[in-house]
C-alpha cells in the first residue's frame, strides 16, 4: 500500500512541476508523505490556491518548505487555521502573505497553539486590534514555546523596567520579531553594551526599547560597536553619544559609510556647523541628505537666514516655507 501511495504522490508532485531531487528532499523531510494520498494532496493544493488565494507560482515554494501541509486533513487542520487567521486580519491577502512567509503555520493547531498564543499576548496588554497584525506580520511566533521561549523574553523585558502600563505589549507590537531572539546570545549582550559602553541610564534603556526595540536585536560587534566607535572618532563626548542614542537610537544602526559619514561631512564642511549642534539634534541623521538637508540649506543660505538645525529640518515642507516666508517659486530655484 505504501509503495502505491508513494508512487501516487510522486506523480502528483511531477504534475505540479517538481523535479525528482526536490521530491526526494521533501520525502526525507516529511516521512508522512510516503503514506500521503494524492487526492488529499490535490484537495489541499487547490484549497490554498483557489480559496486562500496563494499564487500558483508560490505554492511549490510553500510546499517544499512544509510538505506536511499536503498530508493534513482539510477540515481538521487547514480550514480552522485559515479561518482563524482570516478573523485576525483586515485583508484576505494578509493570510496568504503570512502562509508564504512561514508555511509551517498551517501545521499547527488552533486550539493547542494559536489560541494560547493570542491569550498570552493579550495578557501582556496587546490590544485585540493589534493581535492579528502581530501574528500575520511575524507568523513564526506560533512556533515558539510560551513556557521556554516567550516567557523568558517577557521576564527579561520586565527586568528592564518595562513591567507597567502594558509597556511590553507596546514593544512587541512595534517589533514582533524581537520574540525570535535569544536573551543570552543577543538581547542581554546588546543591553549591557548600551549600559556599559554607551552609558545609558535605566530610564535611557527604557526609552530606547520603547521607541525603537529593533536596536536590541542588532549584533554588538558587527553593528553597534562600529557605529559607536565612529561617533567617538568624530569627537562626540560620552554624554553626547548617550544623549544622541536616547534621542535617536537608529544612529547606532545607520550605515557609517552611506549615512553617517556623508551627513557629518556635509554638516561640517559645507554648512560650517559644529558637532555640538547635531549632538543636541540627533534626528539630523534621519533626514534625507539631498532631498531635505541640502535643498533646505541652500534656501536658508541664499536668503541669509540664521537658524538652528532643528528649526530648519523639524517640520514638513509647507511649514518650512511658511516659517521662513518662502514661496513655491522661491523654493524651486
Curated annotation (Swiss-Prot):
Family: Belongs to the mTERF family.
UniProt-listed Gene3D superfamilies: Transcription termination factor 3, mitochondrial
Gene Ontology biological-process entries: DNA-templated transcription termination; regulation of DNA-templated transcription; tRNA processing
GO cellular component, one term: mitochondrion
Job of this protein: Transcription termination factor essential for chloroplast development. Required for maturation of 16S rRNA, 18S rRNA and 23S rRNA in the chloroplast. Binds to a specific region within the tRNA(Ile)(GAU) gene at a position adjacent to and downstream of the 16S rRNA gene. Required for the maturation of tRNA(Ile)(GAU). Binds to double-stranded DNA.
Subcellular location: Plastid, Chloroplast; Mitochondrion
Lineage, opening ranks: Eukaryota, Viridiplantae, Streptophyta, Embryophyta, Tracheophyta
Cross-referenced InterPro entries: MTERF, MTERF_sf
GO molecular function: double-stranded DNA binding; RNA binding
Record Pfam families: mTERF
Protein name stated in the entry: Transcription termination factor MTERF6, chloroplastic/mitochondrial
Organism: Arabidopsis thaliana (Mouse-ear cress)
Reported consequences of knocking out the gene: Small white seeds, with defective choloroplasts, that are unable to germinate on soil. Albino seedlings that die rapidly when grown on synthetic medium.
Protein keywords: Chloroplast, DNA-binding, Mitochondrion, Plastid, RNA-binding, Transcription, Transcription regulation, Transcription termination, Transit peptide
Top-level division of the source organism's lineage: Eukaryota
Amino acid at each position: 500500500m505504501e509503495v502505491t501511495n508513494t508512487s501516487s504522490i510522486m506523480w502528483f508532485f511531477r504534475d505540479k512541476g517538481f523535479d525528482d531531487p526536490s521530491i526526494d528532499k521533501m520525502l526525507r523531510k516529511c516521512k508522512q508523505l510516503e503514506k500521503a494520498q494524492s487526492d488529499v494532496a490535490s484537495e489541499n493544493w487547490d484549497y490554498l490556491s483557489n480559496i486562500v488565494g496563494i499564487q500558483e507560482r508560490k505554492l511549490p515554494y510553500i510546499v517544499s518548505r512544509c510538505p506536511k501541509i499536503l498530508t493534513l486533513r482539510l477540515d481538521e487542520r487547514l480550514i480552522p487555521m485559515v479561518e482563524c487567521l482570516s478573523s485576525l486580519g483586515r485583508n484576505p491577502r494578509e493570510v496568504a502573505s503570512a502562509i508564504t512567509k512561514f508555511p509551517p503555520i498551517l501545521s499547527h493547531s488552533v486550539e493547542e497553539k494559536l489560541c494560547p498564543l493570542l491569550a498570552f499576548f493579550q495578557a501582556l496588554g496587546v490590544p485585540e486590534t493589534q493581535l492579528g497584525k502581530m501574528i500575520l506580520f511575524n507568523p513564526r511566533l506560533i512556533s515558539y514555546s510560551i513556557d521556554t521561549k516567550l516567557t523568558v523574553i517577557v521576564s527579561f523585558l520586565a527586568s528592564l523596567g518595562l513591567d507597567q502600563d502594558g509597556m511590553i505589549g507596546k514593544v512587541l507590537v512595534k517589533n514582533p520579531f524581537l520574540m525570535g531572539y535569544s536573551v543570552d546570545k543577543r538581547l542581554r549582550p546588546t543591553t549591557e553594551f548600551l549600559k556599559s559602553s554607551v552609558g545609558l541610564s535605566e530610564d535611557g534603556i527604557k526609552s530606547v526599547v520603547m521607541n525603537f526595540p529593533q536596536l536590541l536585536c542588532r549584533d554588538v560587534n558587527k553593528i553597534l560597536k562600529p557605529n559607536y566607535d565612529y561617533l567617538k572618532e568624530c569627537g562626540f563626548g560620552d554624554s553626547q553619544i548617550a544623549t544622541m542614542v536616547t534621542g535617536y537610537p537608529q544612529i547606532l544602526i545607520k550605515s557609517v559609510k552611506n549615512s553617517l559619514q556623508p551627513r557629518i561631512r556635509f554638516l561640517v564642511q559645507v554648512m560650517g556647523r559644529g558637532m555640538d549642534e547635531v549632538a543636541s539634534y540627533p534626528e539630523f541623521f534621519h533626514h534625507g541628505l539631498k532631498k531635505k538637508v541640502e535643498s533646505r540649506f541652500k534656501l536658508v543660505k541664499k536668503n541669509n537666514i540664521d537658524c538652528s538645525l532643528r528649526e530648519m529640518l523639524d517640520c514638513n515642507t509647507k511649514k518650512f516655507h511658511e516659517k521662513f516666508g518662502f514661496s513655491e517659486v522661491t523654493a524651486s530655484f
